[in-house]
Amino acid sequence: MSLQLNGKSRGTSPGNAQPLPIFDALCRSLPVGTADEQFWWKLTGRHLARMMLEAGYPEHRQVECLVFHRFKVVPTFGPQPRSAEPWYRSRVAASAGDGAPISYSWRFGTADRKPYIRNYIEPLGPLTGTAADPNNDVATRAFLQDLTTTLPNLDLSLFWTFEPHLVSRFSDKADREKYAGPSVLTGVELSPDSDAIDIKMYLYPRNPEQISQLLSTIIPKAMRDAYGEDVCLDSLNIVKDFLTNHPDGRQLKPRGTTGIDCCKVQDSRVKFYVATDNTSFDHIATVMTIGGRRPLSTEVLDKLRELWYELNGLPSDFPTSEQVPTGQGQELPAGHHGVGFYYDIQPRLALPDVKAFINVRKHAKSDLAAAETVISFLERHGQGHHNPRAYLNVLRDIVPAEELETRVGAQAFYSVAVKKEELDITAYFIPQVYRRFASVQVELNGQRRSRFE
């Protein structure tokens, strides 16, 4: 029996029948809002509630984050889906997404840090997708302005300094139409042990010429504007030298995205994203160590290789210098094979921090196989103290078990960083709003929409 949401069915999850008491209580108490808001709340609010419950968030924090999500985030998602084709294709989750304006991440945690959750969103508004707002800036600006009255820890000064350098502006109508598309995304971090909600911004220039100039001119100029003319650019210059002069570095392609934290300027990261075609482990290890400038222990490199091989189904004696074979019948898009990285080039770091991103659709047989591989790896290496298997309950709340076992698509990436000799792993996944359109309608409403609706 489905629960009632102010007289309307709350719906059921596709594969996890365990109750969500805090979410259910809020559904009974909060204002209904518009039909569009109710759709997004019933879907994404339930997902968020499941994530926080499984991650062991304190009850008061669950309430706080859910109320913030309902009244600050949900209204930015725009019209609910009317078909399997999005009315506006968001850049959230990039090529792994289905056009929905939200995705999620689950950080499994390390010995000294509990699991925690982020949402990644692209606010949508009345001008989104129109000639008046070709890069969907207006809704994001309105959202950020709203947050300044809500989040006392929010500091947007670095974002507003970087934004004019990194967001493309076109005076010519033909160029505006040619390069129309999302240019800014927002990350919403919900830590379990904090009363703050942290905001991250991701900027993407639409003009390809700008992407090629990011490291050489655009980001250095933005950093001088933000930090002063005497800002230390050592980390940036190390990455630039690696990409320019090292054989493995020259294989990296800038993705165009620059990520920054909306906190005190001196504490913010500046993340520069790249990707590669080369899937050999030797290449991946070289990129992670920046050509040996940021050395990793043999133990850590062995763990990285073990995880990479297991995700790809490779035997333990597979040569580290060889490319991962493309599976028979597996179709891969042109360009990189699903391995990306970011370098944190903030001024206070003598050496950049590095994180790798592994595309699940290109490096795993199924969503469940990928999740089981990562969870078993964490348990085997003594990182099971935060119950990583709780993540499976989150996936089952989004996608039925049979789909998890046979398909890829619910998960976008796994990221891997190194923290104190441990692998710090995060899963990135999407709510399947459009990819599972018909099923989502059944789960939320209890009946299929008419094909003519």
UniProtKB/Swiss-Prot annotation:
UniProt KW DNA repair keyword: no
EC code: 2.5.1.-
Pfam families: Trp_DMAT
Pathway this chain belongs to: Secondary metabolite biosynthesis
GO biological process assignments: alkaloid metabolic process; secondary metabolite biosynthetic process
Keyword terms: Prenyltransferase, Transferase
Keyword Transcription set for record: no
MF GO annotations: prenyltransferase activity
Cited PANTHER family: INDOLE PRENYLTRANSFERASE TDIB-RELATED, PRENYLTRANSFERASE ASQH1-RELATED
Family: Belongs to the tryptophan dimethylallyltransferase family.
Protein task: Prenyltransferase; part of the gene cluster that mediates the biosynthesis of neosartoricin, a prenylated anthracenone that exhibits T-cell antiproliferative activity, suggestive of a physiological role as an immunosuppressive agent. The non-reducing polyketide synthase nscA probably synthesizes and cyclizes the decaketide backbone. The hydrolase nscB then mediates the product release through hydrolysis followed by spontaneous decarboxylation. The prenyltransferase nscD catalyzes the addition of the dimethylallyl group to the aromatic C5.
Name of the protein described by the UniProt record: Prenyltransferase nscD
Lineage, top ranks: Eukaryota, Fungi, Dikarya, Ascomycota, Pezizomycotina
Name of the encoding gene: nscD
